[in-house]
Amino acid sequence: MITIIGSGKVGGDAALFSALKRLDDQILLLDVAEGLPQGEAMDINHMLSEQGIDVEVKGSNNFEDMKGSNIVVVVAGSGRKPGMTRMDLLKINASIVKSVVENVKKYADDSMIIPVTNPLDPMAYITYKVSGFDRSRVFGMGGMLDLSRFRQFIHEATGHSRDSIRALVIGEHGENMLPLPRFSSVSGIPLPSLLPKEKLEELVQNTKQVAAKVIELKGATVHAPGNAISAIVEAVVRDRKQVIPVATYLDGEYDHSDVTIGVPAVIGKNGVEKIIELDLNDEEKQVFNKAVENVKGALSGVEI
């Protein structure tokens, strides 16, 4: 069973995409708001009935119902409002995530946890520490969403098929993210061979800023994060051994320890099966290190 804690727009879309991909026979939507997960589940099930997809989506307000879950996605918390940064949400969401993870420990202690709540990297750290799970079983969704946005900008700039584009974004899921043109390509051709430096810099900045633009225009980002969640879940349940940037706990990798930050990792049935260390240049290291310090600084004022 896949459990998604938080039944708002992103949680609902994550359940929808996961059901359409048939990632499990049972998907549970959990939320403290009476009626919300039940109504969301009903709506999705009606769609699945027309599609002929035999996945059962259930809504509940009882944490005990997550017993037996293989994967728990944590989306619970307050979302960004126009003008807010992800870090503005830290104090609001830290206590919510801690409470949720305590319940995951109690009722689904064999599961993997995928934190999604913003600010993502600090929340992934809190999840890892509070759960006490092995680091392979706690990995946050951040870079997967960022690279989908980076891919879209590459598609718009080159005109090439989205399917031919491979992109990579690491670091903080926030203002200090690190889109990596050197490690991105179109049909195997390195991106710097296709676009001038000025254009690459423009794509990087657009990738960093586009979420705020979407929030300004429609109030929230919904479909892209919902799909990114399902893509990570799919890598686990299908044992894809797929290289995905996830927020995972570092213990010496990239010369950093005791921090959770976005890095490329092999994701399969055992969760984070291997962390891949890239040969970053000095400029890239500077941005990555700044992201690490930002996450550590944010957590310094949080009691775990």
From Swiss-Prot:
The keyword Mitochondrion does not apply. Substrate binds at R80, R86, N118, R149. The active site is at H173 (proton acceptor). Its EC number is 1.1.1.37. It catalyses: (S)-malate + NAD(+) = oxaloacetate + NADH + H(+). NAD(+) binds at G6, S7, G8, K9, V10, G11, D31, N93, V116, T117, N118. SUPFAM superfamilies: LDH C-terminal domain-like, NAD(P)-binding Rossmann-fold domains. Pfam families: Ldh_1_C, Ldh_1_N. One of its GO terms (biological process) is lactate metabolic process. Keywords: NAD, Oxidoreductase, Tricarboxylic acid cycle. One of its GO terms (molecular function) is L-lactate dehydrogenase activity. InterPro entries: L-lactate/malate_DH, Lactate/malate_DH_C, Lactate/malate_DH_N, Lactate_DH/Glyco_Ohase_4_C, Malate_DH_type3, NAD(P)-bd_dom_sf. The keyword Transmembrane helix does not apply. Belongs to the LDH/MDH superfamily. Catalyzes the reversible oxidation of malate to oxaloacetate. This is Malate dehydrogenase.
